[in-house]
Amino acid sequence: MTEYKVWAFARSAAPNLPALEEQLAEVMREADRRGYIIVNSCMEQKYGTEFWRPALFAMLAAVQQGRVNAIMVQSLDRLSHDITTLYRILRFLQNYGAVLITTE
């Protein structure tokens, strides 16, 4: 069984901080329930069509450096609404042997 070292990630464009915090809390609860090791977490209030997002790049840097081997989000659209951007992120994870896990 693979031991997942997880970066929990939440994103929303809506200016509703409590909802964003709850989204992250849900991801972290599910990671804990599944027995994953939560290495780090972040949340960002950005549009899902934007690619140049500081929290996203911090998370990808952690993958590249081998600090995490899994990204956990509520759903795929939390990473991006743009299919090309989502593909780029998934290829990046694949290239570094990391996986994407959703709570849904």
Residues of each region from the PLM?
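Short, structured surface patches at the beginning of a domain
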Residues: M1-E104
